[in-house]
Curated annotation (Swiss-Prot):
It comes from Arabidopsis thaliana. Residues 62-109 form the F-box domain. It comes from the Eukaryota. This is F-box protein KIB2. PANTHER family: F-BOX PROTEIN KIB2-RELATED, OS07G0183000 PROTEIN-RELATED. GO terms for cellular component: cytoplasm; nucleolus.
Amino acid sequence: MAPLNSQAAGEEESNYQCRFPRFMHLSWKRPYLTRVFDLAVIQKKQKKEMSDSEEKKCNDDSKQPVLVLDLLRSILERLSFVDFHRGRCISLEWYSASESCLAVKNPTSPWIILFPSENVESKNDSCKLYNPRDHSSYIVRDLGFDLARSRCLASSGSWFLMLDHRTDFHILNLFTRVRIPLPPLESTGDGNVFKRVYENVSDGSCIKIDNAVLWVDEKRRDYLVVWNISRLFGYHKKGDENYSWKVFKPLKKNDCCIDMAFKENKLYVLSVTRKVTVYDFSGGDSPVKCATFPSLRFRNGYSYNTQGCHYKVAVTLSGEVLIIVAKVEPYPRVECFFAVYKMDHNSSGYERISLGGEALLLDLGITVEANCMKNCIYFSNDQFHRYNGKSLCDDSNKNGICVYHIRSRYVVQVFEHLTASSKIAFKDARSFFPIFGGKWLL
């Protein structure tokens, strides 16, 4: 990584393009400590390129000074989020020092990821990340597959469940570039075969996986994927002997799933009857039904029209089950209505509530402790209009990434600037937490 000269620095107004092998292209102000970090990266690269004989002759590790952990921590704590996680990859010493900094460096507010629309002229394998805490944006390039013709179905930390334009699944970590292949959609294991009838579909939009959840435990190197089509549920765990999806059909013939969430080994399924059923995946091969919540019934005198509303399920920090009634009209300006209901165990009905000091991430189906955006809902228009083929840059969808305040009933933040000046057309946006809890080794 060549140092910037003064002329180049002046032309770029103290911003630069960081080019690290197979990593990120981003812009930020370059502090002195980043130069120290870059030097360490260069030294590692040079060391790797040396032959074994040259290394023994020119660089005896036992005679080289090793930075003490306190100094490494001091450097890591002053690096940007992306540089911090690049630094973890330099050596075992850097990785060990970073472990004590993870609680500081893991974000406490959700990031936003934007996925590209298909570009007919060239393959597009870039996506955009946005950190609202310091208003920094990153472009992730060279992911090694056609991202524009794939669709993100769910996320867990820094991991994303992707379905390509055929019927192939994989789990992707954007930061480490680890990809875990999953069984294809046809492999359901019990004769429920989905044929590859969408070979010429451009972006996977005709493969309508209704809902999906992803759970990844980096420390235990474990994962679970569950997807749903109508009444059919498919799931796959790490270590399953058969390379296929296990299937179960828990809903009645005239019922189907409209949303689901996952937390602490439990799958929360919201059906079209607005009933929530909970399935426990912590046991053996098959999930076990462990709880049922009655249908959401509106009491007399509710003050809004439910026609055209969407229904979502979520789980709070304390484990309470929520049903969210949502109505979003993106054009000509964002008009939203959200109502959050919680089960009232005393009356066996639902009561309308606020979130207090928590915030709701509809993409993840969970609430989190909120530092600033309290009693708010993070959502994107695409959640309610997926598979419509529209770009987030379209006039009818450009205000597609929003934060809604429950008490005031207004959209209090719109991230229009993420798409307004971009040369890339984005088809989807999601909130996620880029958490690094351990080193994933396959």
